[in-house]
Amino acid sequence: NLYQFKNMIQCTVPSRSWWDFADYGCYCGKGGSGTPVDDLDRCCQVHDNCYNEAEKISGCWPYFKTYSYECSQGTLTCKGGNNACAAAVCDCDRLAAICFAGAPYTDANYNIDLKARCQ
């Protein structure tokens, strides 16, 4: 769920607030369209697509689905015992948090004009 995703981001990118990723580029945050502005925004586009795939699992609501995972020294592990939906959502969030950690953050791409830059 979104709370767990926030915690995963804080695990892999402890130097930044999770909020910095909530309104970044064209895809980080609610919705998404157009061409990603950079690698970090591409991470969010992939995450959005991953959630779309997870939603194809019967009764799976990624934004609200809880799952079992562990954060140890910046390393994320989705635990066994998750059902198909929980496992899929956990993996979406884990891969995005790892992607965020490896992508440069450009302050100028925070809170951009979506209408002008994301067509």
UniProtKB/Swiss-Prot annotation:
Describe its function: Snake venom phospholipase A2 (PLA2) that has an effectively inhibitory effect on A-type K(+) currents (Kv/KCN) in acutely dissociated rat dorsal root ganglion (DRG) neurons. This inhibitory effect is independent of its enzymatic activity. PLA2 catalyzes the calcium-dependent hydrolysis of the 2-acyl groups in 3-sn-phosphoglycerides.
Give its localization: Secreted
Where expressed (tissues)? Expressed by the venom gland.
Per its UniProt record, the required cofactor names are: Ca(2+)
> What is the protein's name according to its record?
Acidic phospholipase A2 natratoxin
Question: What keywords appear on the UniProt entry?
Answer: Calcium, Disulfide bond, Hydrolase, Ion channel impairing toxin, Lipid degradation, Lipid metabolism, Metal-binding, Neurotoxin, Potassium channel impairing toxin, Secreted, Toxin, Voltage-gated potassium channel impairing toxin
Q: Which GO terms describe its molecular function?
A: calcium ion binding; calcium-dependent phospholipase A2 activity; phospholipid binding; potassium channel regulator activity; toxin activity
The stretch of residues making up the signal peptide is none
Task: Supply one GO CC term from the record.
Answer: extracellular region
Q: Which domain of life is it from?
A: Eukaryota
